[in-house]
């Protein structure tokens, strides 16, 4: 069996595994999940009238997701379950795409399967996969753009490079209508890729031409959305009159919680760094213990819930939190259980941070001064995903300043973290992921299925 066929088989198996986990959770309930009742209503109205009918709740355009859901409603009749079931092909395509991306960036076959399942079976992705929320379709559009941009990087000629970039621009400009944040693919990832490939003839000019066309299409789509009855555009900048000190402190907690939440979702990979704790000297171990203990005491005293953020994770794992209909949801984990997992996340993150400081940081400084070149996958990651990630977090800041950064907002960043951690593990520790990581993944998968079911 040749390599492409082998990778295709593994990607399909990952997609089927996530679909099987979703079916095992039996996500059947004729009621809303977070905001998807509003989106389902819009799909139902489109199936009945052929028009987009908003209801004053959604800040997302919804785009092709409404058409896709309406198709299933037309074919099988309306129900919450049927409309949510329409997302299953999108869920499986997202998982397949992620596996393909990991392989293209140089992740080994075994680790690519592990990384894909870490995302697909996570307590954040699986409940959203069983809903009609726009988060998973948004991630699909972003991953599709990343895949096409990576194909452009790997292309052998300037003509094929431009063709791949054209597909990336077209798919993102159209697909991003489901969730506006996905348009960062065409607005940021595309020109970043063009700049990386600027030495190829005509690529830089073509990429910025495609960027202009995409920006114009996005502007016209937003104009159309703003004129729809009961649409709900969300301003980027926070309103005047807010207490800057109070809200800045609030923002700091929100961003810190978001980072911890991302680390929690990649914990099956992150836990592999525990195998390196024996290489730490006594001074490093003392600092590690002090920081971890300080974090634990602070979180216990203040009842800070990070990394168990609102919406999905808090509903799954906090026994003191009620569902939006007032009924108790998944019994959750006791406080000591959540605290223990949080402390383990902090410990492994600190070990990783120490390794990044000692090994990666000198390489980045040498590259910045022009002394050395970054290895191929890291140069591609830097240009394709670096500006995208920065812009993504910049757009989260106004939300965190005013309200909260929900765990669902972090879904597109988790595949990036998975990719980077797997490559770092392969380079610095060992090629295969250790057995302890598989054990943690199995526990996470069981919790995800149970939480999604309830």
What is each model feature region?
Residues 15-18, 282-322, 364-399:
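Transmembrane alpha-helix segments characteristic
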Residues 103-109, 145-164, 193-199, 425:
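Membrane-interface transmembrane helices that cradle and orient dolichyl/undecaprenyl
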Residues 191, 195-326:
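Membrane-lumen/periplasm interface segments of specific transmembrane helices
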Residues 212-213, 287-295, 338-350, 354-389, ...:
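Signature aromatic-anchored transmembrane alpha helix within multi-pass, membrane-resident enzymes
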